[in-house]
Amino acid sequence: MGRIRVLSDQVANQIAAGEVVDRPASVVKELLENAIDAEATRIRVEVEAGGRKLIRVTDNGIGMMRDDAMLAFERHATSKIRSSDDLLTIATLGFRGEALPSIASISRLEMITRAQGEETGTCIEIAGGKMLRVEDAGAPPGTSFTIRDLFYNTPARRKFLKAESTELSHVSALVTHYALAHPDKHFELHSATHALLNAPPVNEPSERVFQIFGAETLNQLIPMAAERPFDRAGLPEPPPWRRDQDYEPPDPGFLRVKGFISKPALQKLNRNSIYIFINRRLVRDRLILHAITEGYRNIIPPTSFPVALLFLEMPPHEVDVNVHPAKTEVRFRQSSVLHDFLRDSIRNALMKARPAADFLAALSASEPVSSVLPTATPVQDSEVIPAGSEAAGEVAAFALTEPVLPSVEQPLPFARAEMTVPQVQGAAGSAPAPPAYPAVAGAAARVPGGNCGHDAGPEEIPPPGGEAGTLASLASLKPLGQLRESFILAVNDEGFWIIDQHVAHERVLFEKILREREVERVHRQRLLMPLLLDLLPHQMVRFAEIAQELERNGFEAEPFGPHTIAIKASPVGLEGARLERMLVEVLEQTGTGTQSENLETVRTRIAASIACHSAIKINTPLDPQRMEWLLAELARTAHPTSCPHGRPIALRYSWKDIQRAFERI
């Protein structure tokens, strides 16, 4: 007798359940999607013991008649598709017909449903995949699923469940996801003791965000919306001999995105606050996560993550949702188009977070402070300055520190983001609240409107120009001095500022390097003696890959043996040990990705490393003229609130904070 056997339907369903249902949240997901597909406007979810003992999902959708209700528990029975061609135009959340039989095979299930227009409903009870009871039942229109004792007949699966609180948190996160995606529906989530979520229907997504996260989070979010047409190439078309005279090529459709992204000041330690929906379907996709990360590159630290709520809409033929039974993994026909579109849309939204007119007007109205400072003369790529010469000494005094030349009109290879300067906060994670009474003794006496007397009321204090820090406000800063020769103390009508001189100069140099490179006006100096640098094997491989990009940034280097390179010229301001450290850092950083990095990423990393090693260091005294110049140049940058590595540049104590500290208000 043969060794191969055909598995029973019950065993097959339990195996399928391993892919579809791995925890209580998976059950909730499948039942929620069924309710949404059934056009429900109110969905109630109840759980006990984290979903182990009880999961109940009740909706007021279209319901089912008895025959359909019984057939729904057969494998691959569905009302969503009829043929394989329908897979190309799936518009519903469910379509595989696997969820209900899989859930019924590993739990004790009861379903009560009544179709719209029917007088009576149907009650079906199933345990371990065996139908126990089917009878008429009185019920309101809609469907109610009650799942008890999940994994009761598969103890090996049950023991892998986490603590009740952990499982409940997964269920809560899932319901929150769908409540955000469908603001027109009423969602409720209840545990055995209290209500966890009650979100009535609203008209706008922003109202739903307010319901779930509150006003504080909503104020830290930036709305975004963008669209672009898809490329026609690759669309399925019939052969010429099968086309009729009235044949028209298929419309490729549009790619659209709308939603919210967080301001740079709001940062998280993981990706749990990134919500992604494609055609209202919850997905977790690496490509989209990478595009979001790229959109925030050089704006927040690489170890921090933004908050994002993104709804992507595209024609069904552009996305394949039939990749995994859980339907959270998808594939895109034009993945590179989607990635670049989403990355650029995020950057543009950050740029438009506030009107740019105020910043541009401030720049045009202010006289550049840099006109009174010595500057290095720009040279073409072919020109070099011998190290050690008198000219090199003059250039090194302000190496890479001259302002961006007004004649350079080309945009930076990344979008300009205009952001409010954050108040006192950490560099990563959720921004903590500023201290209630910042220590500003000494500087407070020079704040406009300051008064030592306590008899003056708030109405006697001149109002500041505005509470929110803006790009224009940086140009109006007046330096007071330095704190330990590392931080610039400055004031304007908005309040008191502390600026990290190193990261501020780093931001100025970073954007200047990118601009100069775009027009091939790189400053370089030739070394009197070539600098020999020994590299590890993987570093030599990486050097060969980015040698051309290094040359565009002012380096002249070539292999000198199997594990050595000879550096003959370098960007102005980089010499000796700093030059060695910078090159090793670039070779290590650009080689840590799991995939081949794009050219723009390599360029920005090289520019960021050059800027970091060339910038003014801490513990460096600056005269008032140099401080004024640095603040003016910082105001000209696209992202004056963070360095290329995401560290904050400035902390602002607003006028209101200062008044509150001295009990004026």
From Swiss-Prot:
Which CDD domains does the entry link to? HATPase_MutL-MLH-PMS-like, MutL_Trans
**What are the GO cellular component annotations?**
mismatch repair complex
Pfam families assigned to the protein according to its UniProt record, in alphabetical order: DNA_mis_repair (PF01119), HATPase_c_3 (PF13589), MutL_C (PF08676)
The record ties this protein, via SMART domains, to: DNA_mis_repair (SM01340), MutL_C (SM00853)
Any GO BP annotation: mismatch repair
Here the disulfide bonds are: none
- PROSITE patterns noted in UniProt: DNA_MISMATCH_REPAIR_1
Provide this UniProt record's keywords sorted from A to Z. Answer: DNA damage, DNA repair
Q: Which InterPro entries match?
A: DNA_mismatch_repair_CS, DNA_mismatch_repair_MutL, DNA_mismatch_S5_2-like, HATPase_C_sf, MutL/Mlh/PMS, MutL/Mlh/Pms-like, MutL_C, MutL_C_dimsub
MF-aspect GO terms: ATP binding; ATP hydrolysis activity; ATP-dependent DNA damage sensor activity; mismatched DNA binding
Q: State the HAMAP family in the record.
A: DNA_mis_repair (MF_00149)
Q: Briefly, what is this protein's role?
A: This protein is involved in the repair of mismatches in DNA. It is required for dam-dependent methyl-directed DNA mismatch repair. May act as a 'molecular matchmaker', a protein that promotes the formation of a stable complex between two or more DNA-binding proteins in an ATP-dependent manner without itself being part of a final effector complex.
Family from the record: Belongs to the DNA mismatch repair MutL/HexB family.
Q: What's the name of the protein? A: DNA mismatch repair protein MutL
The organism encoding this protein is Acidobacterium capsulatum (strain ATCC 51196 / DSM 11244 / BCRC 80197 / JCM 7670 / NBRC 15755 / NCIMB 13165 / 161)
Gene transcribed to yield this protein: mutL
